[in-house]
Amino acid sequence: ASDVYKRQARAIHLGFALTLAFLIFPAVRGKKISILDIIISITGALSCLYIYFFYDDLVNRGGILLVKEIFGFKVPVELIIGATGILILLEATRRAIGLPLVIIAVCFLLFSYFGKYAPDIISHGGLSVKRLVGFQWFDQEAIFGIPIGVSVDFIFLFVLFGALLETAGGGKYFLDLAFAMVGKMRGGPAKAAILGSGMTGMISGSSIANTVTTGTFTIPIMKKTGFSQEKAGAIEVSSSVNG
């Protein structure tokens, strides 16, 4: 039962993320969020919540997508929902991260469909649109696979409590302690970042959450004291991973 709840939690998690993506990132940088963005965000959230509400039916049908007869026409309901969700996710990725990752994702989707035309060493029979959408959107091994699971089980929780810790002054305490110990030394901000990340890592236990939590403080401080943006980021990442 817990496994079922985890899978449903992933759907809620992605739906929440899609909603935020379209409400925070406009279609074009510098533009305001439009009514269309709000509609798309709601549509993306509903595509995810469909999995939450009808998860048992999806499992019982064993990957067969639902087709309903509406006004005498057979409508592939779940094919439409899944395809819509995938397209909205790609657009959210473009807005939040950039076009390169979207291009990579689209290339793999095309490879899944046109696999029989690929070179022999990587060729396969190819997936139909139904199987492709069904696997990508309604299966636990694709979009709702391990990365979303890690985000739900670890990253989100640690980032949330890291934000609470920061609001309560805990993050500042760790950094103040680190700066008090090594701040006057040569390269003090970098050493303080390493110590601060190590101490925060004892609480979070997650390198990614550790980077997000402590990097908010340490990277700007290192940049102010003369470290380049790249070096400051590299120091924070390495110290958070080892911490």
Which role does the model predict for each range below?
Residues 11-28, 44-51, 80-93:
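Central hydrophobic cores of alpha-helical transmembrane segments in multi-pass inner-membrane proteins
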Residues 32, 60-160, 177:
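Hydrophobic transmembrane alpha-helices of multi-pass solute/ion transporters
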Residues 37-47, 81-87, 101-104, 193:
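Hydrophobic alpha-helical transmembrane segments of polytopic
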Residues 1-5:
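Short, small-residue-biased leader/transition segments that mark boundaries at the very start
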Residues 161, 165-175:
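Juxtamembrane interface elements at the cytosolic ends of transmembrane helices
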Residues 28-64:
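Alpha-helical transmembrane segments and their cytosolic membrane-interface
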Residues 176-243:
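Hydrophobic transmembrane alpha-helices that form the pore/transport pathway of multi-pass ion
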